[in-house]
Amino acid sequence: MQGEEEGLSRYRLRPPTPREERLVEGFLRAIGFKVNPYAEGMTVLDPGGKFKEVFYLPWGLRRAVERLPLHYSAGLNLGSIGERGFRPSLHLARELAPLCGSPVKCIRLSPRGEKLFLYSRDVYGDNIASHTSGAALVVGSNGQPLGWGVGLSRDGLLIVKPLRDLGWYLRRGG
């Protein structure tokens, strides 16, 4: 029983390291924030695998969660940290969608562009209603969040490359 408890002890939320804070803050700056709005409540779940999950847990809930013997998740899932850095979650996309345009950088797609994006395909030209360069929240023609992408321009052609889209749940996320 003691070995089992020790194995489960890794499922505890902890404060982020300075490196983890920098990765999340770097992403938030890239999409338009001047400061990290989640800095005071960021927590990390590091079960020892390839990825660490990053959550925002308001201070009012922190004491209640700390009393629990096991943490799987708590609060708003901001994303994960892996070998390639910080990867924002779809939960964060939904949370930030109302801030599209100010301060959050957004790319808006046409209905056809939405379909391409949700199949994790690059979106080009007329399928992009509004474009910005770099990492951005991608929304549909109705303003609903579709995921995260990168806006590019090559030889005058606008391109959106998906980073994570809602279709991911059907393809890989289970």
From Swiss-Prot:
Any one GO MF annotation of this record: RNA binding
Coiled coil: none
Signal peptide, first to last residue: none
Record family assignment: Belongs to the UPF0113 family.
Name of the protein this chain belongs to: UPF0113 protein APE_0516.1
Organism: Aeropyrum pernix (strain ATCC 700893 / DSM 11879 / JCM 9820 / NBRC 100138 / K1)
